[in-house]
Amino acid sequence: MAAMEWIILTYDTSSPHKNHLKMVTILAPAKKFMVVITEIFAIIKGVCIGPLDKFPQFPSLSYLKLGHIARRRPMENGGNNMNVLVINAGSSSLKYQLLNPATGALLAKGLCERIGIDGKFTYKPQLEGKEAIKAADVAMPTHNEAIAAVLNALVDEKNGVIGSMKEIDAVGHRVVHGGEKFAKSVVITDEVMAAIEECNPLAPLHNPANITGINACTAVMGKDVPQVAVFDTAFHQTMPDYAYMYGLPYEMYKKYGVRRYGFHGTSHRYVSRRACEILGVPYEDQKIITAHVGNGGSITAIKNGKSVDTSMGLTPVEGLLMGTRCGDVDAGALSFIMDKEGMDGAGLSDLINKRSGVAGLSGISSDMREIEAAVAAGNPRAIMTMNVYNYRIKK
C-alpha cells in the first residue's frame, strides 16, 4: 500500500476573495491525490480547498480535516481515473451510481428497495458483457447490508465493474436539508454530521435517512474513503431575503430558522447549466426557469447563474401538487382541519406529506401512469387531478 501523505494548507483569509493560497507545506513526498470536491472552492474555518487551478502542482487535492491539516489518500487507480460512488438513501431504499467524473462514464447503477422488510436488489452494470440483477431477493435488515450488497455487486468477479473496493475513491451523498449552515458541498466530518443532524427537524422524512446512508457507508467501507455531502438546499442560499422570508413574526426566523429554503437544488443547477451548454449561451448571463417534475416537484428562477426564487419552502411540502404532498395550501385551512378532525401536529404532518397531492385528490394513486390511464378511461377525479397538477406547474 502506498504511504499516506500529509500537507498543511493555510489561506490568506484577509483577502477579499478568501481564496488566496498563502502557504502549502509538504510533509512527505508529493504524489497524486484524489479529488472529492467539485465546487470551485469551499471555505471551512479559514481553510480552503480550491479553486484547484490556482495550484496546478496539486491537481487533485482531497480529504480536508479541520485544523489546517489534511491527510491524503493516494489514488489507487491513477491520476484522472477516479471512481465516485453516489448514494441517495431513503428510509427504506437506496439508489446508487458508480461514476468516473473525469470521463463522464457511468459504470453501474441500481437500487436497493424494501430495506428492513424483505429486501429487493437491482444492479445494472454499464459495461459490455456484464449481466444485470433485477429485483433479486437479498436480505437487507439495515442500510449496512444494502451498502454491502452494492459493493459485492460492483466487485463481483464475473459481473463487477471494478477490481476491488480500493478503486472507489470517494462517496457522494445526497442530503436534503442543510439549512443555512451549508451553501456548498462539504467533506463529511464529525462536525458536519452534527450540523446535518441539527437540520433533522426541518426535513424529518429525509435527513435521518440520508444520515443512515452516510453511517452505513462508514461502517462498511471504513473511514479512509472520503465522503461528501451534497445538499438540496445549497443552491438556493443565494435567494434574497425578500424571496425567502415568510410574513410571520421575525422571532420565528431567529429562534427556529423558519424561512423558505428550497430543494432539488442540485437538479436545478445541473439542468440550467446543461441547457446553456446545449444552447451555446453563457450561463452567467441568462434568466432561466427550471422545473424538477417527479413524485416531488419544484420550480426555480435562476438569474445570472444564481437561484433567486423557488417554489418549495421551509420543507418540501410547499409549492406544486406532488405525489403525496399537498403543495401550496392556505395555512388557515390546516388549522381548520386540525380543529374539525381533532388532529395533532403529527397527524397534520402525515396528512400533508403522505395522504395528499395526486394520491389524495384522485383517490387512485400517486403514480402518474395510473392517473393517465384513469384519465384515458374518463375518470372524473383523475381528470380533475391532472388539471390541478398541470395548472400548478403553469402558474
Predicted regions, residues:
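Short, Lys/Arg-enriched N-terminal segments with co-localized hydrophobic residues
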Residues: 60, 64-81
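Adenine-nucleotide phosphate-binding core of ATP-dependent small-molecule kinases
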Residues: 350, 357-361, 368-395
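Short glycine-rich, Thr/Ser-proximal phosphate-binding strand/loop in the N-terminal lobe
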Residues: 93-140, 313
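Short beta-strand-loop/turn "lid" adjacent to the catalytic site in phosphate-handling enzymes
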Residues: 154-206, 226-228, 234-243
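Glycine-rich phosphate-binding loop of actin/hexokinase-like ATP-binding domains
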Residues: 235-339
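Short hydrophobic targeting helices and cationic amphipathic motifs
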Residues: 9, 20-21, 27, 56-59, ...
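Cationic, amphipathic, low-complexity segments that mediate targeting or membrane/lipid association
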Residues: 24-46
